[in-house]
């Protein structure tokens, strides 16, 4: 028999979006389970790790409430601070523009965020793959065994090939720009 558990919120994917969502849910009193299939949070690295300065983001999205995770992170996560970006296009054009930000060590940053979620009260299970989602039940398999987990809310932060999105009819399709934008937010 597969053991059962119950949480207010199950977050699938412990990248920046998933760990931040788990942290805020836990801070607001929810029982939270944060799941990630990887052996080590942040590895393998999923992207280059550029993070614009919070003031740059706030200037673009004036009414947005930015999470603390975009504003406050340890210097140990910063590989380099920058104030200028240069982009080389495929046809060898160069675009340069001023933008303040930091290049982060994504492995350290992702681990920092997962630690913040755990400190806020979220439970973290790594090496755990989501095998099925049916309604509000998440089935997992991993080093902790197989579980059936009931959740009041399921947050899919599991990337562009999201099992959560597929289970909710939001799978990535080539014809839908809205779905593509939604699915690529991490």
From Swiss-Prot:
Signal peptide: none annotated. It holds the Pfam family FAD_binding_3. GO terms for molecular function: FAD binding. InterPro entries: FAD-bd, FAD/NAD-bd_sf, Geranylgeranyl_reductase. Gene3D superfamilies: FAD/NAD(P)-binding domain (3.50.50.60). Belongs to the geranylgeranyl reductase family. ChlP subfamily. This is Uncharacterized protein in nifH2 5'region.
């Amino acid at each position: 028999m597969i053991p059962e558990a119950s949480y207010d919120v199950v977050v699938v994917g412990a990248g920046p979006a998933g760990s931040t969502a788990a942290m805020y849910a836990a801070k607001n009193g929810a029982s939270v389970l944060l799941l990630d299939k990887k052996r080590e949070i942040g590895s393998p690295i999923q992207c280059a790790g550029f993070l614009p300065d919070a003031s740059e983001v706030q200037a673009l999205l004036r009414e947005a409430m930015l999470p603390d995770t975009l504003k406050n992170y340890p210097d140990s996560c910063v590989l380099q601070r920058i104030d200028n970006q240069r982009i080389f296009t495929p046809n060898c054009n160069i675009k340069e523009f001023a933008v303040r930000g930091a290049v982060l060590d994504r492995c350290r940053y992702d681990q920092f965020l997962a630690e913040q979620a755990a400190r806020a009260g979220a439970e973290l299970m790594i090496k755990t793959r989501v095998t099925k989602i049916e309604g509000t039940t998440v089935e997992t398999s991993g080093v902790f065994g197989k579980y059936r987990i009931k959740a009041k809310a399921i947050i899919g932060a599991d990337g562009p090939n999201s099992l959560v999105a597929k289970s909710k009819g939001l799978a990535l399709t080539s014809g839908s720009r809205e779905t593509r934008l939604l699915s690529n937010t991490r």
